[in-house]
Amino acid sequence: LTRILAIDTSSAWCSVALSIDDERPAFLHQKVSAGASQLLLPWIEQLLNTAKINLSSLDAIAIGVGPGAFTGVRLGLASVQGLAVATKLPVLPVISLDAIAAELIKAPAFLAAAPKRFLVAIDARMNEVYWAHYETTPSGLPVRLGEVALTSPESIVLDDIEFVAGSAINEYGDRLFARSKNVFLKTQLDPEIGVSALGVLACAKLSWCAGLAQDIHQLEPVYVRNKVAFTAEERKQANI
């Protein structure tokens, strides 16, 4: 019996999922304008109450650790730290692009394209993109090839990429495809998919089965970038 609570607040959405054994996960997911802090804990309580279990009876808590919105990533980690310390539960950190990839493989457009390699790219603000390459596997979730990168849209490497997904598509358009030699790539897209607790949960289940749960004191955010915003001088030079 495996019971995992999954949380993600690294984007503009508050997202919580509860998985009990092989049952369909309970899932709450909503776009939030002023951060997820007011929704997160009540939602967790709601899911636990509906399932008639308490927090301490969980096996682990999964959390999206970024990259994404700095304040959202911090909120999620702080909330999980409070919950895990109180209950002595282990945690399962999940990188946001991995969570997107885990859900993407079920999307109709992706299934129709059946790519071997694909790219997940999300808007990182400041004219930059968080991105990573993935490879599909015969069974289970896709495998990330290397670390998550942070570059300008034009610098994204698209060699052998057959499908592109993520918020960077709508934000940067043709700039993303500057280095693509594949004229069909612009038709193999999923611009709407984003990170959610269901994707976090899918990755976390694999981590749990592989024995990769961590002590809460090992939990760290994945920011990729160390800087939150342009300075006034940088904004002036870039005409922002």
Segments the model singles out, each with a brief description of its role:
Residues 1-65:
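N-terminal beta-alpha supersecondary unit
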Residues 23, 35, 90-194, 223, ...:
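Surface "functional belts" at beta-alpha junctions
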Residues 31-39, 70, 74, 78, ...:
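Residues at secondary-structure transition points
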Residues 62-96:
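DPxDG-like acidic metal-binding loop motif
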Residues 185-240:
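Acyltransferase
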